[in-house]
């Protein structure tokens, strides 16, 4: 299984690099080529990092300590090396550093569990169906920013929207970590004790209700203060957009639970993929209607509507 997963990831990484280098030829991106090349290292690094292997073996202590160490290194570099707006390449490097260190350490340590063999076999097809959902989800998650930039042609508008998205993602990442911890155990228990698996699902749902809604409401009420604290006064114009995205946090978190911890584990991959497709189509249609009129606010509202459609 591990060799199959690594083989698939290497194939998809190769395809990603082909598309990436084709994108570098676009004249509009000429000024960002060096920056894009730097960030492109994360494609191969995330592949050889085999983070999924450590989730399977529930090595959460190792994941936490490793992530903490490299994040500290990244933050120290950020505050000591980045002095002005002209240091954006150094800033990008500090973001990549944590990924480089974590993934290289993962790959070296993975030999403790498995011996990887690159191979292309008929068994790979078994994994393609559930992985298609992940691909669709990744495309869906960047659709709003891509369309906002394409329709408005305003980098400032996209930057403001990205700041709001980044702050909102802090909340969703909390629950993503929760799913990463519980999901392997639920999948394991489904084959041995279905009642225990359902109890874990019930616990997850209760934790979402306990933390998700209060956190989103609190951030909704304090959006202006949070933006001023973490992004600066220049970003206060995105306050209403961020408040809309807090509504999206509530809906998206429940969707993620339903899809990743219920549909996928119960082998309802088709339902998961269908939901993402419906959300993507809804998002594209509404973005086309709202972004020309409302800009970033329209993109945020369309994202909420798309999550509700899912």
Tell what function each PLM region has.
Residues 3, 33, 61, 88-89, ...:
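Residues that define the loop-to-transmembrane-helix transition and helix capping
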């Amino acid at each position: 299984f591990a060799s199959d997963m690594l083989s698939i990831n290497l194939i998809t990484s190769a395809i990603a690099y082909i598309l990436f280098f084709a994108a570098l030829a676009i004249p509009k991106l000429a000024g960002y080529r060096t920056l894009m090349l730097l960030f492109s290292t994360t494609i191969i690094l995330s592949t050889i990092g085999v983070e999924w292997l450590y989730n399977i073996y529930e090595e959460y202590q190792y994941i936490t300590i490793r992530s903490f160490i490299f994040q500290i290194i990244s933050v120290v570099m950020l505050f000591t090396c980045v002095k002005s707006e002209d240091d954006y390449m150094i800033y990008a490097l500090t973001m990549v550093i944590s990924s480089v260190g974590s993934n290289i350490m993962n790959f070296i340590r993975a030999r403790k569990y498995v011996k990887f063999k690159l191979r292309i076999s008929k068994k790979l097809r078994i994994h393609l169906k559930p992985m298609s959902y992940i691909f669709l989800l990744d495309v869906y998650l960047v659709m709003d920013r891509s369309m906002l930039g394409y329709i408005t042609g305003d980098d400032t508008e996209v930057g403001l929207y990205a700041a709001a998205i980044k702050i909102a993602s802090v909340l969703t990442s909390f629950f993503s970590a929760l799913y990463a911890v519980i999901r392997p155990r639920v999948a394991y228990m489904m084959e041995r004790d279905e009642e225990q698996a359902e109890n874990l699902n019930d616990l997850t749902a209760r934790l979402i209700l306990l933390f998700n809604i209060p956190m989103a409401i609190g951030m909704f009420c304090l959006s202006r203060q949070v933006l001023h604290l973490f992004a600066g006064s220049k970003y206060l114009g995105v306050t209403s957009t961020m408040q809309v995205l807090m509504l999206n946090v509530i809906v998206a978190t429940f969707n993620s639970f339903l899809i990743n911890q219920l549909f996928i584990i119960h082998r309802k991959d088709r339902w998961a993929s269908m939901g993402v497709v419906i959300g993507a189509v809804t998002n594209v249609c509404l973005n086309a209607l709202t972004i020309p009129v409302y800009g970033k606010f329209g993109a945020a509202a369309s994202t909420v509507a798309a999550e509700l459609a899912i």
